């Protein structure tokens, strides 16, 4: 008997069926004579994430290259027609119990490419809520069904990288605001939000695409595959992402409950590198109030580039960093940052805020959210500390606790051509509160805050901010990660 382990699995997802079941039946439900279908992809609401005021365009090129080009070429067009048609018809018969000749699949295979045109906002630019970020339409009248057949694949591939890039952008903007208020310069900003999310993401692909979204605004990451993803689908002449040596609880506990020699051991392992040490495996406050003073001279003797970064990983996020005035001990009343100031000292910057000695620092990464980050930054400012004294390890609470509904992403058909006549179509449910109302007709994005709808294929769209990036199986406009980051930087 053959073992399942003996099967060579190239791909489990059938390229002609990268959709919801009901999509396979819509082809025969459209009006007779249908030729062209045009749809928009739009973030409709930020009600579930009101801090996301700007929605960053990101992930389109990677999606196109990975799926619309490579996946279809490798798993559909490069195989025999009989094989891909049989694969489709057998699956439909076995699951829906419907006879489907698969003629449309055969016709697509014979054509040899996806007859689709996609326009999108340049990656790295950000739009306001309700501004379309992408349009999709078929270019061959025999394949009107293909436009919205791809809806499911587009949504599942794009909502998360766009949402994560938008979150990273919002974090960076907020960190910039606190830096402008409390710091002399902004050199710390590219590293102040560090991606810790990989282990909490839903899949490796989620970690790659979301992690790449984080990297549009930051350089600090522990999600290694995100860097490889950017290299593969965008490329860059500059540093994409980086990290530093760091310990984890297994390391600390393996050395025993007396963590003073463990701190010293790790510092000796990395005498010339910045080093992050998780400090709460046994007794966080003992490490801060007893062990760090004993290590003070050794830490100060290290090169400035070999800063020791203290990482708390439990307790109340605010009181650990900023202190609790009701606590029973002085160190708990002060919090980590003030304790580090008492031990190592620092300087007062030109804006009157305290900056820790450059040999010591702190990172907090336990369940960080936007709201927690802001509260910590406000707490430090109130205590007279510059925002640069803290780095945030941003994990799955930030990047995985989202859905397509976080920004209300949807693809809706807004124009159809039947027997040569184009007409605007739309969705406007009377039972809806306005969220699900779609545009009408073709659209043109006139600014990153506004658009015009009600247009036809005959209207002048030469000034449309939506640019053609994919047409008839080819990527027709390429961007790189440096350009994306430049677009991002221009909006800070």
Task: For every predicted segment, state its role.
Residues 20, 78-81, 101, 143, ...:
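Helix N-terminus capping/helix-initiation residues
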Residues 2-49, 101-102, 106-115, 119-350, ...:
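Buried, small/hydrophobic-residue-enriched core segments of structured protein domains
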Residues 91-94, 152, 199, 412, ...:
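Generic signature of intrinsically disordered, low-complexity segments enriched in small/polar residues
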